[in-house]
A protein has these predicted regions:
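Low-complexity, intrinsically disordered terminal/linker segments enriched in charged
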Residues: 6-27, 31, 138-146
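K/E-rich alpha-helical interaction surfaces of small helical-bundle regulatory domains
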Residues: 52-57, 131-134
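Short solvent-exposed beta->alpha transition segments
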Residues: 19-36, 41-42, 46-49, 56-104
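Generic N-terminal initiation segments characterized by hydrophobic and/or small/turn-forming residues
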Residues: 13, 20, 93-96, 110, ...
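Exposed beta-sheet edge and beta->alpha loop/turn motif
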Residues: 100-146
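Juxtamembrane proline-rich low-complexity "stalk" or linker regions positioned immediately after a signal peptide
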Residues: 1-3
Length: 146
């Protein structure tokens, strides 16, 4: 029985999906772990990324009006120093390591992580409080240099 062969049909070029664009960075689901939008972890990752990308005003926006520096001196001076450091100092890796969060009261969390600046690494602690703008830093300290 001589069956009829059907020639393959070439796809219509107009119906082809456009080639996917290359991403500047891997999708979020390849990150250290899935991070909920609006979560304290997301706020800390965005803060760290803004610093790594030298965006001083974006970094400064993460500090709450209630921010109190661990060192003596006012919050305004501390945030100005931080902006200078972000703009002109060593840029940290955008990726934070060993990020842990714990509750510190209603709408308040303490987040610890390792932040690397080239060969130097520091264990940092941020205390964040949730306000109308989202999670904002109310305290920041370096726990140790690794």
């Amino acid at each position: 029985s001589g069956g009829m062969t059907i020639p393959p049909v070439a796809p219509d070029p107009a119906k082809l999906e456009p080639a996917p664009k290359c991403l500047d960075q891997p999708p979020a689901y390849f990150g250290p772990k899935a991070v909920m939008a609006g979560s304290v972890e997301e706020a800390v990752y965005v803060w760290a990324s803004a610093w790594a990308n030298r965006k001083p005003d974006q970094v400064a926006a993460f500090y709450s009006p209630q921010f109190r520096p661990a060192e003596n001196g006012g919050a305004t001076a501390y945030i100005e120093d931080r902006k200078q450091q972000v703009a002109n100092g060593a840029a940290p890796d955008a990726r934070l390591e060993d990020l842990k969060t714990k509750d510190a009261g209603p709408d308040r969390k303490v987040v610890t992580f390792v932040q690397r600046f080239g060969k130097d690494a520091y264990v940092k602690e941020l205390t964040l409080a949730k306000d109308a703008q989202g999670w904002r830093i109310v305290a920041e300290r370096t726990l140790q240099q690794l």
